Amino acid sequence: MTSVSEHSGEHSVEAREGHVIDIHTTAGKLADLKRRTEETLHPVGEAAVDRVHAKGKLTARERVYALLDEGSFVELDALAKHRSTNFGLGDKRPLGDGVVTGYGTIDGREVCIFSQDATVFGGSLGEVYGEKIVKIQELAMKTGRPLIGINDGAGARIQEGVVSLGLYSKIFHNNILASGVIPQISLIMGAAAGGHVYSPALTDFIVMVDQTSQMFITGPDVIKTVTGEDVTQEELGGAHTHMDKSGTAHYVASGEQDAFDYVRDLLSYLPPNNYADPPQLSVPVPEGSIEDNLTEEDLELNTLIPDSPNQPYDMHEVITRILDDDEFLEVQAGYARNIIIGFGRVDGHTVGIVANQPTQFAGCLDINASEKAARFIRTCDCFNIPIVLLVDVPGFLPGTEQEYNGIIRRGAKLLYAYGEATVAKITVITRKAYGGAYCVMGSKEMGADVNVAWPTAQIAVMGASGAVGFVYRQQLAAAADNGEDVDALRLQLQQEYEDTLVNPYVAAERGYVDAVIPPSHTRGYIATSLRLLERKIVQPLPKKHGNIPL
C-alpha cells in the first residue's frame, strides 16, 4: 500500500517515492487524485494480492473486470473509508472498505455490480461496506438494471458492533424489494459465512465454484462445539453440497471463468427488469405449414419414445431437439434430477423449460422436484418468460419419508406457482400424465394456454396395473377362488383398460388437450403458440398477495 504522510500546515502530500505534491495547485490536485486512485487498486498492499493469486483466485476488482465488457466498468465510492475508531480500526482505513461497487455492461447490456474483497478485514461487513452495497442495490432498482453480487466475505465486522447487523438488514430488505423487479444474481467466490449467506439466498440465482466456494451459517468449529459433529468446510457448505443436497446453488462452476461465462449466458435469457420482455433473437417466420418446415431433428422425435411404457428415455433428447441450435442452459442440474429446468429459445423466443426426467424415479414428482420446479416457474413469471412443460409423470413419489416431510404442502407449491403464473404456458405430454401429477404438470384446467399430446401419451387417473387391481378386485378374487389363471386375466384386463382409457384421445374428446400431434411437429406447434401468445393479457383478481403454502 502506498505510504503517505500529510503535512497539513504546508498543504502538501508526500508520495511513497518522496515526491511532494502541492495540493494547492491544479496539477497537484490531479496528482493527488491519481495517487488515491492507484491506492484503491491495492487497498491493503500488493502482498495481499499476491496471496490471492497464489490460491489461483482473482481479486475483487479483477473479478469485476473479468465479468464485464472490457473498459465498461464505472466505479462508485472507491474512496470511501470506514468511520470506526474501536479496537484500533482508526489506524486501518483502507480505501473502498472491502467492497468494489459500480456499473458496466455485459454483452452491451447495463448491469450494476458489487464485488467483496476478502483481503480487507477478511471481507467482513461494516457500516460503510454495507452502505456501498445498499447504494448500488438502490441504483439498480431505480434504473431497472440487473444486480450481480460477487460474494467473498466472512460475516459481520465484529469491531463495528450492531451497525453491521443494521446494514445487513437493509441489504436483505433491498433484496426483497428488488425481487421480481430486477434479476439478482449471486456468485459465491470464497467462504461466505454468517450474515453473508442470507443476501445470496434472497436472490434469483446462485453460482458457486467447485472446491473454492462455501456457504454456511455456522462453521465447523461452532458445530463441533455445540453438537460434537466433525465436518469439514467443504462437506458442510461446499458447492456440491449446495447443489446435490440443499438445492441452494443453481450452478457449480469448474473455476472462476466458468462462473463468469455461465452468468453471461444466463443474462442473455433475462430481461433487465419486470417491465421489459426477455431478449428475442430476430428469426424469420417460416413460410408454409409446420409439415413443410420439418427438419431431421424434428423427425428424430418420432422414434424417441420406447414401445414399452416402462422403459426410460432421456428427456434432454427431447429438449435439445425443440430448441434453437440445440442450446439449453440448464439450472440446478445436480439437484432433484427427476425434474429438468432451464432456458432456451424457440424461433428466437426465450422460453423456460420444465420437464420430467423418466431416467430418475421414472419421472415421479417428489418434494425436491416440486420445489425446484415451483421456484423456477415463479422466476420465469417474474420476468415475462414463457413456460414450456414437457410431461412424462406417473405420479408423486410414494413413501413414508415423502409424507412425513410434507409432500402434500410442499408439492402444493408447484400447483400454486403454475396456477399463479400469467405468462404464456404451453404443455406437451410426451407419455405418462397420471392422477394428481397430471393436474400439477400444466393441465388445461390449471391455466395452460396450449396443451398438445403425442400419440404415445397416457392420460389417466392411474396406470393400467393399479387401475385393474382397484376396479376389478372382486373379479380377480373370484377367478382365484375358481382356480383360473389370474395373471392371464389381469393382463387381459390391463390391455382393455389401456385401450379404452390410457391414451390421449379421451382427453382430446373433452378438450383437455387441444391437439394430438406427431412428435415431429412439436417445435412448430410451440413456435406458432408463442407467436399467438405474445399479446396474452391476464387480469388477476385484486389482492395484496396470495398465500403460497411455504
Q: What label would you give each PLM region?
A:
Residues 2-550:
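Ligand-binding clefts of soluble mixed alpha/beta catalytic domains
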